[in-house]
Amino acid sequence: MTYNRHRILCEPENVDLLRNAFKYVMGQHHFKIDAIVILPDHIHALWTLPETDADFSTRWRLIKSYFSRQCHSQYQGKISTSRQHKGEKAIWQRRFWEHQVRDGRQGRAYGDRDFVNHLEYIHYNPVHHGLVNAPKDWQHSSFHRYVEEGIYDQMWGASERLIFDSDIGME
């Protein structure tokens, strides 16, 4: 999530910068992006990490650092003294939520309910936040790849309001 929920992530140059950050980090610390959505002030992602390296925190730190180094001068805002002393920028909040999907190997075959719940939560999130009426209308989402692969119908999530368990997305 961005610092003070600044709505900067969907600006075209920042979407490109995020893509570059992900590519750079994936080149150094392999992982697969199973699902992702970039919203104006936060990102949701579902990753598969190597069995021998489940360090998601380092990956997020590197992605955020890469992004911040490239654009921080545009977003210099008022930040706390403690953040200034730590060399932090006014782009990202310090914390993030994570959840380890149970048996992700089955999940990639779309059989694991925990995986599917998170996949659907991610792809429906732009609708949940009132940004679009249907997941297909949100440009910065892996939803389109899933439609191309025949996993989702293009109209999924368009006609009914989906409700998720209160703990999904808050891990």
Where are these regions (language model features)?
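Short catalytic/metal-binding and nucleic-acid-binding patches
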Residues: 1-171
